[in-house]
Protein backbone atom coordinates (compact mmCIF):
# COMPACT_ATOMS: atom_id res chain seq x y z
CA UNK A 1 0.00 0.00 0.00
CA UNK A 2 1.32 3.45 -0.90
CA UNK A 3 -0.01 7.00 -0.72
CA UNK A 4 1.60 7.94 -4.04
CA UNK A 5 1.37 4.85 -6.24
CA UNK A 6 3.10 6.49 -9.21
CA UNK A 7 6.10 7.53 -7.14
CA UNK A 8 6.26 4.12 -5.45
CA UNK A 9 6.23 2.09 -8.67
CA UNK A 10 8.86 4.38 -10.18
CA UNK A 11 11.16 3.93 -7.18
CA UNK A 12 10.44 0.22 -6.67
CA UNK A 13 9.38 -1.27 -10.03
CA UNK A 14 9.91 -4.87 -8.89
CA UNK A 15 7.70 -4.55 -5.80
CA UNK A 16 4.07 -5.65 -5.75
CA UNK A 17 1.65 -2.81 -5.03
CA UNK A 18 -1.73 -3.80 -3.57
CA UNK A 19 -3.40 -0.43 -3.72
CA UNK A 20 -3.43 3.21 -2.69
CA UNK A 21 -3.47 4.31 0.95
CA UNK A 22 -5.70 7.34 1.44
CA UNK A 23 -5.79 7.33 5.24
CA UNK A 24 -3.60 9.02 7.81
CA UNK A 25 -1.39 7.46 10.48
CA UNK A 26 -0.88 8.98 13.91
CA UNK A 27 2.55 10.37 14.77
CA UNK A 28 2.20 9.02 18.32
CA UNK A 29 0.83 5.48 18.09
CA UNK A 30 -1.34 3.37 15.81
CA UNK A 31 -2.43 -0.24 15.46
CA UNK A 32 -2.04 -1.59 11.92
CA UNK A 33 -3.73 -4.87 10.96
CA UNK A 34 -3.28 -6.87 7.77
CA UNK A 35 -6.29 -9.00 6.81
CA UNK A 36 -6.63 -11.70 4.18
CA UNK A 37 -9.40 -11.63 1.57
CA UNK A 38 -11.59 -13.70 3.91
CA UNK A 39 -11.01 -11.11 6.70
CA UNK A 40 -8.82 -13.44 8.72
CA UNK A 41 -5.90 -11.60 10.40
CA UNK A 42 -2.50 -12.15 8.80
CA UNK A 43 -0.37 -9.76 10.82
CA UNK A 44 -0.70 -6.91 13.29
CA UNK A 45 1.64 -4.36 14.81
CA UNK A 46 1.27 -1.37 17.11
CA UNK A 47 3.98 1.28 16.89
CA UNK A 48 4.89 4.11 19.26
CA UNK A 49 6.97 7.28 19.01
CA UNK A 50 8.98 6.91 22.22
CA UNK A 51 10.59 4.37 24.51
CA UNK A 52 12.50 1.71 22.58
CA UNK A 53 11.05 2.76 19.22
CA UNK A 54 13.30 4.67 16.74
CA UNK A 55 13.07 8.40 17.53
CA UNK A 56 14.01 9.50 14.00
CA UNK A 57 10.84 7.95 12.54
CA UNK A 58 8.41 10.30 14.23
CA UNK A 59 6.53 11.84 11.33
CA UNK A 60 9.21 14.40 10.53
CA UNK A 61 10.98 12.76 7.62
CA UNK A 62 12.27 9.18 7.95
CA UNK A 63 9.88 6.26 7.61
CA UNK A 64 9.60 3.30 9.99
CA UNK A 65 11.03 0.20 8.31
CA UNK A 66 11.06 -3.47 9.33
CA UNK A 67 14.67 -4.67 9.53
CA UNK A 68 13.98 -8.41 9.34
CA UNK A 69 10.85 -9.94 7.78
CA UNK A 70 11.33 -13.12 9.83
CA UNK A 71 11.64 -11.33 13.17
CA UNK A 72 8.85 -10.59 15.64
CA UNK A 73 7.56 -7.25 14.41
CA UNK A 74 5.90 -6.57 17.77
CA UNK A 75 9.36 -5.80 19.16
CA UNK A 76 10.63 -2.22 18.71
CA UNK A 77 14.16 -3.51 18.07
CA UNK A 78 13.04 -5.11 14.79
CA UNK A 79 12.23 -1.65 13.39
CA UNK A 80 14.50 1.18 12.28
CA UNK A 81 14.21 4.69 10.92
CA UNK A 82 15.01 4.85 7.22
CA UNK A 83 18.55 5.90 6.31
CA UNK A 84 18.27 8.60 3.63
CA UNK A 85 22.03 9.19 3.26
CA UNK A 86 22.27 7.10 0.08
CA UNK A 87 19.11 8.57 -1.46
CA UNK A 88 19.67 12.28 -0.87
CA UNK A 89 22.38 14.51 -2.28
CA UNK A 90 23.69 17.95 -1.49
CA UNK A 91 21.29 20.83 -2.16
CA UNK A 92 21.82 24.57 -1.94
CA UNK A 93 19.25 26.70 -0.10
CA UNK A 94 19.05 30.47 -0.15
CA UNK A 95 16.52 33.08 0.92
CA UNK A 96 16.37 36.81 1.57
CA UNK A 97 14.50 38.71 4.27
CA UNK A 98 14.68 42.03 6.03
CA UNK A 99 16.15 42.09 9.50
CA UNK A 100 12.89 43.36 10.96
CA UNK A 101 12.68 43.11 14.73
CA UNK A 102 9.68 41.43 16.35
CA UNK A 103 10.12 43.34 19.58
CA UNK A 104 12.13 40.61 21.31
CA UNK A 105 15.47 41.02 23.10
CA UNK A 106 18.25 42.50 20.96
CA UNK A 107 21.30 42.28 23.23
CA UNK A 108 22.66 39.10 21.58
CA UNK A 109 24.22 39.14 18.13
CA UNK A 110 24.03 35.54 16.99
CA UNK A 111 23.03 33.39 14.04
CA UNK A 112 21.04 30.33 15.14
CA UNK A 113 19.99 27.10 13.41
CA UNK A 114 18.36 23.83 14.45
CA UNK A 115 16.08 20.99 13.39
CA UNK A 116 12.39 20.95 14.29
CA UNK A 117 12.65 17.36 15.55
CA UNK A 118 15.18 14.58 16.05
CA UNK A 119 17.30 14.02 12.97
CA UNK A 120 20.65 14.31 11.25
CA UNK A 121 21.86 16.42 8.33
CA UNK A 122 25.17 17.59 6.90
CA UNK A 123 25.77 21.33 6.47
CA UNK A 124 28.41 23.40 4.68
CA UNK A 125 29.04 26.88 3.29
CA UNK A 126 26.69 28.68 5.69
CA UNK A 127 26.54 32.39 4.89
CA UNK A 128 24.73 35.44 6.17
CA UNK A 129 25.24 38.45 3.89
CA UNK A 130 23.89 41.91 4.60
CA UNK A 131 22.80 43.98 1.56
CA UNK A 132 23.69 41.25 -0.99
CA UNK A 133 22.90 43.52 -3.96
CA UNK A 134 24.73 46.54 -2.57
CA UNK A 135 27.68 46.91 -0.24
CA UNK A 136 27.62 43.22 0.66
CA UNK A 137 28.97 42.32 4.10
CA UNK A 138 29.57 38.74 5.30
CA UNK A 139 28.34 38.37 8.88
CA UNK A 140 29.84 34.95 9.71
CA UNK A 141 33.30 33.42 10.05
CA UNK A 142 34.39 29.79 9.57
CA UNK A 143 31.41 29.23 7.28
CA UNK A 144 32.95 26.15 5.61
CA UNK A 145 34.23 24.53 8.84
CA UNK A 146 37.80 24.25 7.60
CA UNK A 147 38.81 25.45 11.09
CA UNK A 148 36.76 22.74 12.74
CA UNK A 149 34.00 23.93 15.05
CA UNK A 150 35.81 27.16 15.95
CA UNK A 151 33.26 29.89 16.65
CA UNK A 152 30.27 27.53 16.67
CA UNK A 153 28.44 26.37 19.81
CA UNK A 154 26.38 23.16 19.94
CA UNK A 155 23.78 23.55 22.69
CA UNK A 156 21.28 21.27 24.45
CA UNK A 157 19.74 18.54 22.32
CA UNK A 158 22.04 19.58 19.43
CA UNK A 159 25.19 19.05 21.54
CA UNK A 160 26.24 15.85 19.73
CA UNK A 161 26.79 17.77 16.49
CA UNK A 162 30.39 17.89 15.29
CA UNK A 163 32.61 18.77 12.34
CA UNK A 164 33.59 15.74 10.25
CA UNK A 165 35.24 14.91 6.95
CA UNK A 166 32.78 15.05 4.06
CA UNK A 167 31.90 11.40 3.20
CA UNK A 168 31.79 12.33 -0.50
CA UNK A 169 34.86 14.59 -0.54
CA UNK A 170 37.73 13.68 1.82
CA UNK A 171 39.34 17.07 1.24
CA UNK A 172 36.34 18.94 2.63
CA UNK A 173 35.02 19.52 6.16
CA UNK A 174 31.29 19.67 6.97
CA UNK A 175 29.09 20.08 10.02
CA UNK A 176 27.29 16.87 10.99
CA UNK A 177 24.20 18.24 12.74
CA UNK A 178 22.73 15.73 15.19
CA UNK A 179 19.49 16.67 16.94
CA UNK A 180 17.75 14.68 19.66
CA UNK A 181 14.65 16.88 19.59
CA UNK A 182 13.12 20.16 18.50
CA UNK A 183 15.10 23.40 18.47
CA UNK A 184 14.01 26.22 20.77
CA UNK A 185 14.46 29.97 20.85
CA UNK A 186 16.85 30.08 23.84
CA UNK A 187 18.40 26.61 23.83
CA UNK A 188 18.63 23.33 21.90
CA UNK A 189 20.31 24.64 18.76
CA UNK A 190 23.62 25.52 17.09
CA UNK A 191 24.74 29.14 17.24
CA UNK A 192 27.60 31.44 16.30
CA UNK A 193 28.27 35.07 17.19
CA UNK A 194 28.20 37.52 14.29
CA UNK A 195 31.66 38.56 13.09
CA UNK A 196 33.01 41.65 14.82
CA UNK A 197 29.94 41.87 17.04
CA UNK A 198 27.91 43.28 14.16
CA UNK A 199 24.29 44.26 14.71
CA UNK A 200 21.29 43.43 12.54
CA UNK A 201 19.66 46.45 10.89
CA UNK A 202 15.87 46.29 10.68
CA UNK A 203 15.78 48.15 7.35
CA UNK A 204 18.38 46.06 5.53
CA UNK A 205 18.03 42.83 3.55
CA UNK A 206 19.89 39.70 4.61
CA UNK A 207 20.64 36.71 2.43
CA UNK A 208 21.00 33.43 4.32
CA UNK A 209 22.34 30.48 2.33
CA UNK A 210 23.81 27.06 2.98
CA UNK A 211 24.35 23.61 1.48
CA UNK A 212 22.62 20.68 3.16
CA UNK A 213 22.32 16.93 2.82
CA UNK A 214 19.63 15.02 4.68
CA UNK A 215 20.69 11.82 6.46
CA UNK A 216 17.83 10.65 8.67
CA UNK A 217 14.93 11.84 10.82
CA UNK A 218 13.67 15.41 10.50
CA UNK A 219 14.69 17.33 7.40
CA UNK A 220 13.22 20.66 8.54
CA UNK A 221 16.02 23.10 9.36
CA UNK A 222 15.14 26.42 11.00
CA UNK A 223 17.58 29.32 10.56
CA UNK A 224 17.40 32.83 11.98
CA UNK A 225 19.23 35.86 13.24
CA UNK A 226 18.69 36.37 16.96
CA UNK A 227 16.07 36.92 18.36
CA UNK A 228 13.78 35.92 15.53
CA UNK A 229 14.89 38.04 12.59
CA UNK A 230 15.01 36.79 9.00
CA UNK A 231 13.72 33.42 10.22
CA UNK A 232 12.75 30.57 7.90
CA UNK A 233 12.32 26.80 7.91
Label each PLM-derived region with a short phrase.
Residues 1, 45, 79, 95, ...:
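Generic structural hydrophobic/aromatic packing signal, biased to beta-strands
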Residues 1-74:
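Solvent-exposed beta-edge/loop recognition patches
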Residues 2-3, 35, 69-71, 80-85, ...:
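Low-complexity, flexible helical/coil segments
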Residues 11-13, 73-80, 138-139, 187-188:
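Short, charged, solvent-exposed linker or helix-capping segments at domain edges/interfaces
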Residues 15-16, 47-49, 62, 78-85, ...:
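Short intrinsically disordered coil segments
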Residues 21, 51-53, 79, 90, ...:
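Tryptophan-centered motif/residue detector
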Residues 30, 65-66, 75-77, 94-98, ...:
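Short C-terminal domain-edge/linker segments immediately following a structured domain
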Residues 83-233:
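Extracellular and organelle-lumenal recognition/adhesion modules and their flexible linkers in secreted
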Amino acid sequence: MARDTTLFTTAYPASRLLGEFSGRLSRRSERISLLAADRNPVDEVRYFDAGRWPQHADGGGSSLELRDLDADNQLPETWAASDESHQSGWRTYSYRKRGTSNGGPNEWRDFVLGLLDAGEILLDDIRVVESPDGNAVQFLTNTSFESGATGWRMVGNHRLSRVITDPDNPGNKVLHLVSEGATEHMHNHIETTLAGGRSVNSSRVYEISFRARWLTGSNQLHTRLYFNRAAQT
